Amino acid sequence: MTTPFPLSRPRRLRRDDFSRRLVREHALSVNDLIYPVFVLEGENRREPVASMPGVERMSLDLLLNVAQECVKLGIPVMALFPVISSHLKTPDGKEATNPKGLIPHVVATLKENFPSLGIMTDIALDPYTSHGQDGLLDESGYILNDITVEVLKQQALTHAAAGVDIVAPSDMMDGRIGAIRQALEDQGHIHTRIMAYSAKYASAFYGPFRDAVGSAANLGKSDKKTYQMDPGNSDEALREVALDIAEGADMVMVKPGMPYLDIVRRVKDEFKVPTFAYQVSGEYAMLKAAAQNGWLDHDAVMMESLLAFKRAGADGILTYFAIDAAKKLTAHS
């Protein structure tokens, strides 16, 4: 029941900053941020990602400085995405399971130097395959589910053995969460968390990311519609989330983020589990480009966009704005 005007004047509570802050329903904090980074082989290597202004691929020695900044700012988690040399890419993505590969080495080094910083790794084959798909192909080019899951399981075990805190399967193969969870349990990795990319859509917003990890050229004109979700579907997202929770996921994710805030809200309302969203490369690139052209206020739209995730029900956000947002948040704390 609503009290009629003039007894009720909603603008009363909007009049002053103190009262606006007092009744604010949702707030963003540094604890909500996960910072995705792109890591290269070698030393002293830094490569700007042209389609993602302000984002760079970098070698481990330079990434250590970024990790230190994350710790200083209080960002809880860094998410690693590998840029794999073309000579290591094969149709079967075998490099993904190499215990001496790039990601296991980076994980072990980061955890040795920054034990309090949460480290998350991507469980997927597209950075490692010569065709740019997230799985193994049959003769017709169709992604084979079950044998792909076997490779993903080994990839997750390799990362867990290196000391990773969170494995995040982004592949969208059926049954992979259960297989990975059971394998982790069997090998004694009972504390390794799983953040499942549960509702990952076949979106046009991923373009800059594929440039960043170097899979765009391999993928070519192919798509991922046979395993990633149809953007027109909402109920299906709930079924996917339910399956992943039943199979042992500790946290679930919706990707992309801003175009799918309705899915975030439905997932949170339905399951009440830790729910995350990924503000993907295309979302980031749009806001950065508009700000660079003077069409939008950079900091204002950055913070408003992140707050929108919280209002929709997200417990946390993967965002390339994490460092900038954390600086804003800590400056006002």
Predicted regions span which residues?
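Alpha/beta enzyme core
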Residues: 2-4, 16, 29-34, 40-333
